[in-house]
Design a protein with these regions (language model features):
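Short small-residue beta-strand/loop micro-motif enriched in glycine and branched aliphatics
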Residues: 56-61, 115-117
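A short acidic/small-residue loop/turn micro-motif
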Residues: 53, 64-68
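Charged alpha-helix within mobile-element recombinases
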Residues: 104-253
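Distinct, well-ordered alpha-helical segments
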Residues: 77-78, 103-104
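Hydrophobic alpha-helical segments, especially N-terminal targeting/anchoring helices
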Residues: 51-52, 122
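Acidic/histidine-rich, metal-coordinating catalytic segments
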Residues: 82-100, 118-120
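Short, conserved catalytic/metal-binding motifs centered on acidic residues
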Residues: 32, 56, 90-93, 125, ...
Length: 254
């Protein structure tokens, strides 16, 4: 038991020292669901946030009074794919509604690779969670007096629009909207997507074999995805300000 706790702490420490920098708009999206209580509204309100990680561009959110179920999330994603194109990867947490069979079918049909957070390190999806924090803070600050769900839904849309047009230091003073729509975006064909999937699958298998039983398949898959992203210049990983070279299967655990 003590050894398990020690390994858990080491994993968390390694993750907290790493910073991921997403380079290519359109290649990796993230999604998560957050909840918020408003003073004049009963119960909780739920917001499904989906964003492009490289640009920070937040797509139109789905707002509900109950936590969205898998088919609802899938339907919302499908609309976004039709409107904005398909990412190559979709980052998400491990909640059942974000890992529902309907979503798995949608991703498979569109040849999109799921990329789940490690169970031991929730901040792996930190970019999308920071975006949620911005939305909630701005909602409470500027629209805290809304009295109907309709007003809340409209206010959430306005907040997302404002954030997409806010200059960002990490974008060199540009906005998420400009970076997503005006910059080069990934647009992989079905054939290329299949090639990427096969490469990652083979790499993950090799990682498991080399680990001699000390590596779970989902961790190996996550490592293989990260290796591909770094090698193809979609992602850079820094550790305490130092940019790391291409990751090997034995060092990239997040």
């Amino acid at each position: 038991m003590i050894e398990q706790l020690r390994k858990e702490r080491v994993r968390q420490t390694r993750g907290s020292q790493r910073k991921l920098y997403w380079k290519v708009p359109g290649s990796v999206w993230g999604m998560d669901i957050c909840e918020i209580r408003m003073v004049n509204l009963p119960g909780k309100q739920f917001i499904l946030c989906v964003a492009d990680l490289a640009s920070g561009y937040k797509f139109a959110p789905m707002v509900t009074t109950t936590e969205p179920c898998g088919p609802q999330v899938s339907a919302h994603l499908e609309k976004l794919f039709e409107q904005f194109g398909r990412p190559l990867f979709l980052k998400r947490d491990n909640g059942g509604n974000l890992n529902h069979g309907a979503i798995a079918d949608l991703l498979s049909h569109n040849h999109i690779l799921p990329l789940n957070s490690p169970c031991y390190y929730a901040p792996y999806n930190g970019a999308i969670e920071r975006g949620q924090g911005e939305i909630k803070w701005k909602l409470r600050r500027e629209y805290g007096d809304v009295r109907t769900f309709g007003e809340f839904a409209r206010s959430t849309g306005l907040v997302v629009h404002d954030l997409n047009h806010h200059p960002r230091r990490k974008l060199d003073g540009s906005t998420s909207c400009i970076r997503f729509f005006n910059g080069p975006r990934v647009n992989y064909s079905k054939r290329k997507r299949k090639e990427v999937m096969l490469w990652i699958s083979d790499q993950a298998f090799d990682i498991v074999e080399k680990a001699s039983g000390d590596m779970k398949p989902d961790a190996a898959y996550r490592i293989a995805c990260q290796i591909w992203l770094v090698k193809n210049d979609h992602l850079s990983v820094s550790k305490l300000g130092e940019v790391l070279p291409h990751l090997s299967g034995k060092t990239a655990h997040n």
